[in-house]
A protein has these predicted regions:
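Short, His- and charge-rich active-site/binding loops that engage polyanionic ligands
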Residues: 75-107
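A short helix-loop-beta-strand connector motif used in the catalytic cores of GNAT acetyltransferases and
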Residues: 61-71, 92-93
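Beta-rich nucleic-acid/ligand-interaction surfaces
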Residues: 56-64, 161-164
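Acyl-donor binding region in acyl/amide transferases
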Residues: 95-193, 197
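A short beta-turn/loop motif at secondary-structure boundaries
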Residues: 60-65, 181-185
Length: 244
């Protein structure tokens, strides 16, 4: 679906010039998944994160996790980047964040916290150079998920060279030192921010992060399994989603 920040952003703010050319689409068909896995391979190989492989594809067991939404970000109809958004709840904990940093996250989940874990952020190397604001429009999906699911905390697994970006945009802080990520040559640290505390500051600094309730519903509502209904039921008392 077309991105729908509200109000419309100026061309002079981050992401504004690209905003009206972007579509967010769930990656669901075998053809779309293959294109995504190939793009991941090219991006990771270009970034020195993996060695060449015969398959030229990168996928993992969490791609079809019931608590994950995998989006493609399309500019003028072309797949340019992707983000997989995990919703972590006491009942649903499947992600690399809990696999790598379970000693930190599981006790908090046991206390009832809700996390949004944006993972597998990749961009087509040529498109990343062509569209310097593409990262902002990609990570925006994680921010919208925090709003939609009434999350307590936004997470990020981040390599050292990208930590400054997450501090600047989402006011994230490092809460765990780098650990090895499966099948990748560089370690990742665990970063986090309290969503309700930073929300207004982020919106003021980056208006591109604004959204409508309609946009969030269109992005995260799906019928192929019961997870969405279970999550919305859990959050219903504080939800921003109108009841039908």
């Amino acid at each position: 679906m077309k991105s729908g920040a509200e109000p419309r952003t100026s061309l002079f703010v981050r992401g504004g010039a690209l905003f009206d050319r972007v579509d967010y689409r769930l990656i669901e068909t075998p053809e779309d998944k293959d294109c995504l896995y190939l793009m991941r391979y090219r991006a990771y190989l270009h970034g020195g994160l993996i060695l060449p492989s015969e398959s030229q594809r990168v996928s993992d067991r969490y791609d079809d996790a019931p608590n994950a939404w995998t989006f493609g970000i399309y500019v003028d109809g072309e797949l340019c980047s992707s983000l997989r958004v995990h919703v972590l709840t006491p009942e649903w904990r499947m992600s690399y964040a809990t696999e790598l940093f379970g000693d930190i996250l599981h006790p908090r989940l046991d206390q009832g916290e809700i996390f949004i874990d944006p993972a597998r952020f990749v961009a087509e190397p040529e498109k990343a150079q062509r569209f310097p604001d593409l990262p902002y429009l990609t990570v925006r999906l994680g921010y919208l998920a925090c709003e939609h699911f009434n999350a307590d905390t936004g997470l990020a697994l981040v390599r050292a060279e990208h930590q400054a970006f997450y501090r600047r945009v989402f006011l994230n802080e490092t809460i765990a030192e780098p650990r090895s990520f499966p099948n990748v040559t560089k370690k990742v640290a665990l970063m986090a921010s309290d969503f309700r505390t930073v929300r207004e500051t982020v919106l003021a600094r980056f208006p591109i992060m604004r959204s409508s309730a309609f946009e969030r519903r269109m992005l995260f509502k799906r019928d192929r399994h019961s997870f969405h209904e279970a999550v919305i039921s859990t959050f219903e008392p504080a939800s921003i989603i109108p009841s039908s």
